[in-house]
Amino acid sequence: MSDDARTPRGDRAGFPPTRKSLGQHFLTDRRILGRIADALHLTGSETVLEIGPGRGALTDILVERAGRLIAIEYDRALAELLRQRYAKRNNVLIAEADVLEVSLGELAAGPYVLVGNVPYYITTPILFHALVPPRAERSVYLVQKEVADRLSAAPGTKAYGALTVNVAATAKAETLFTVPAGAFAPPPKVESAVVRITPLPQPLLVPEEERPFRLLVQGAFGMRRKQMRRVLRSLYAVDAVVADEVLQGASIAPEARPETLSPAQFALVLRAFRDRKQKLAGDVMDSGGPSQAAAGE
């Protein structure tokens, strides 16, 4: 790769040295940076949230295409340098913050798109965090190829897991292209890929189901080799009879394992358990409630 295809790096651009403790690997290939910006399909009016702008290589492109740009940078030194760099840009805000502590929707204060070269050691937490409504209209991430493979994995495969299911319940994930290690400074030791996540027009879940669904899925994949009967007994503190009734209501065999269930099947389990709880509550109310016996003692 010739030098003219790369952005300035390190001290030559006046930036502080790379901090390995923050998992910093700066993308320097201008062609790939351009492809990432293209993948956002910006029209010039959008609010763009950029996670981890680093030295501003992608930011330089986005400021010319976005209506408003909010860059979230954890590294204090980089955040200050970026503020100075874009001080004359009225459409740019540099937010010095931990992205996991920020409500993305509140920060955007309206519709937004999301992009980021996220630190690989916290990629999964960031992806989960970005699923919290109000979600981006579309998101483009530079991630480990392993994560990209997990996002598109099929049930029953090794890569299939909680991340796969939670994203698929509300959005479509697609791998756009891979990125060689030589496109970064310093080069990472893993393969990378660019993925785009777009909300589904008709998601599997209604908003009030999303949090209990996420807890169910993450809990289940913590026991991915256990039978679903055992999973429900552990997660919901119910006996085998109730667990089997719930699974029967979802048309799932009690012996099935979490790693074989589709996102739609997890949604059925959640609703079957909710229906079972509502029926039990109704039965208790019809019988006068458990407190009557206690009151008579």
Regions found by a protein language model. Name each.
Residues 1-219, 248-252, 259, 268-275, ...:
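Catalytic cores of RNA-modifying enzymes
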